[in-house]
């Protein structure tokens, strides 16, 4: 038996089976044990191959591709610690729903737990984080091609959310051999190779989807009540639909930075601190939350404390998604589908004073930030930097909170992020995947520690199919800890950890454009030129370390003193 040839036959069938379930992008790291998978991917005309030398970044590249394409994306890595490096991206996908297929090459069973090189226990390595796991046997002609393709079809049909881990042991040799061998094994599938459908067309009915989505029987009753809408993470079209729907009902909509609703009541993180605004919201009889991953501290505090008669949470992702554990209903379905089944009825707005508090908060922001070139000012004016027909990727930590609190993004403008586990690892890689999936002009904004954490992902940005700007807000450390009651004496050394770096040489190292503007007009002009010029440019904005956190705290205090508005 020519082991190397049959390994490749096995891998070719595996990759072809995945394409029948919509896999179009595949991300590949270098490695020898994964050779059968890599060669099969390279030879498959249905696959677009992406490569990266760092498996942690590779996993996040796939995550970004899956986010923006809404398609399942496959990843190939070799055995050993290369597999473990996929963990952060897998965890994020499990929380935010992107479908990843992790193809992890492995040593055969006889090389495990005996001191063989680069051999670790890969089965079950990811514990409960994958949605599904398949441990394939070592390739052998004794196992039919029908078994392999049916196993893969069954797993892919069940994958509605999160990651599928397929562990793939391969014995040596991995190279050479007569390519004509074992053609009969592949040919046993007949004309399937010329088809475009799965071998096994398995239909899965998750519990929430046994029947088409039915309208809530008492919706016509509740839509006549005083309601509040909370908008978390959702798609661009869903955000537009929700904004119009809430406006017709006359219900206030509190939109997260990721909601793509246009945040009709901007600066919610500020005005929600006003006692009178809280009193108004307390009159709500029903709260409807669409999407999860809320950013605002004040919104989360209000969401936890509110006690409406009913609390409904609508999101296509499974699970509870409500850490406050409200009494009410958890409806698992796409936001747009729910809205179409639950029409709004035009009603007079019941909480008009909230708009006044929002306008006052926004005016306070404009006054406070006037003439500043600061982290807070960039967050407030970020919408002015967005490219036409483009997209935005927002990092984690302090910057996303400042944009949420001080900015207002256009309704329906695509916004992406990693707000499942909210880590700062892999943000540049994820942004690269988002850009590759859509080929749209892309603005990505992250902090300096996030950029350092994923610095070698700048290699992924060298070849972009549309203009890309990476905006690094350098506040010299993790200044989000300045918002928290961390011990002052230990804050800098053990929490913020300032690194005293600039990113000019990093940009040069990876052949990227670079700019370091010193004013808002300079920043705006640099970004505008980037959209015209193309390629990728790293723009570094150096700001005083704690100014962003201090400005946010100052504005919260100022807004609480806004005079009470008559209802």
Swiss-Prot record:
E.C. code: 2.2.1.9
User: Can you tell me which family this protein belongs to?
Assistant: Belongs to the TPP enzyme family. MenD subfamily.
Say which domain of life the source belongs to.
Bacteria
Q: Which keywords does this Swiss-Prot/TrEMBL entry list?
A: Magnesium, Manganese, Menaquinone biosynthesis, Metal-binding, Thiamine pyrophosphate, Transferase
Its assembly, as annotated, is:
Homodimer.
One GO BP on record is: menaquinone biosynthetic process
Q: Which reaction does it catalyse?
A: isochorismate + 2-oxoglutarate + H(+) = 5-enolpyruvoyl-6-hydroxy-2-succinyl-cyclohex-3-ene-1-carboxylate + CO2
List, separated by semicolons, the cofactors it needs: Mg(2+); Mn(2+); thiamine diphosphate
Organism equals Yersinia pseudotuberculosis serotype IB (strain PB1/+)
The record's free-text note on cofactor binding: Binds 1 thiamine pyrophosphate per subunit.
Record pathway: Quinol/quinone metabolism; 1,4-dihydroxy-2-naphthoate biosynthesis; 1,4-dihydroxy-2-naphthoate from chorismate: step 2/7; Quinol/quinone metabolism; menaquinone biosynthesis
Q: What is this protein called?
A: 2-succinyl-5-enolpyruvyl-6-hydroxy-3-cyclohexene-1-carboxylate synthase
Q: What does this protein do?
A: Catalyzes the thiamine diphosphate-dependent decarboxylation of 2-oxoglutarate and the subsequent addition of the resulting succinic semialdehyde-thiamine pyrophosphate anion to isochorismate to yield 2-succinyl-5-enolpyruvyl-6-hydroxy-3-cyclohexene-1-carboxylate (SEPHCHC).
Transferase in keyword set: yes
Top EC class of this enzyme = transferase
Q: Annotated Gene Ontology MF terms?
A: 2-succinyl-5-enolpyruvyl-6-hydroxy-3-cyclohexene-1-carboxylic-acid synthase activity; magnesium ion binding; manganese ion binding; thiamine pyrophosphate binding
InterPro entries the record matches:
MenaQ_synth_MenD (IPR004433), MenD_middle (IPR032264), THDP-binding (IPR029061), Thiamin_PyroP_enz_TPP-bd_dom (IPR012001), TPP_enzyme_TPP-bd (IPR011766)
